[in-house]
Amino acid sequence: IIFMFQKEVGEKIYSKFPSSKYGRLSIITKYRLNIVKKFFVSPNCFFPKPKINSVVIHFIPKIQKYYKIENLKNLEEITNIFFSNKRKMINKNLKKILNMNDIKKIGNLDLKLRPSDLEPEIYYKITDLINKR
């Protein structure tokens, strides 16, 4: 599947961890898709000429996923909870949705990190723990 997006939106989709553009869109799309940035499109390619640049992105469905998330809606909700307070530490949000035993199952996790400091796999683990309840 190939789509064209506004450059800024596209950067949020294909950004990798860690980067300043990394966030909800990156995490959710990368769960199901391999994402390949193809090329940028100049505003001069359109009439009337827009004030923005565009990017073409190729989405390739993943055949094998390392995490099996049964309810993708939970991943959307979890990333929404964390990234709505992007500059806050994860400890309060994590304690709202998981008990201490579940938090320990995630592994060696520093609760003073911010949402953008967590790799996508951590969000997949959290979602998996929520789904198993």
Regions found by a protein language model. Give the residues of each.
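Class I S-adenosyl-L-methionine
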Residues: I1-P120, N131-R133
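Short, Lys/Arg-enriched alpha-helical microdomains
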Residues: Y123-I126
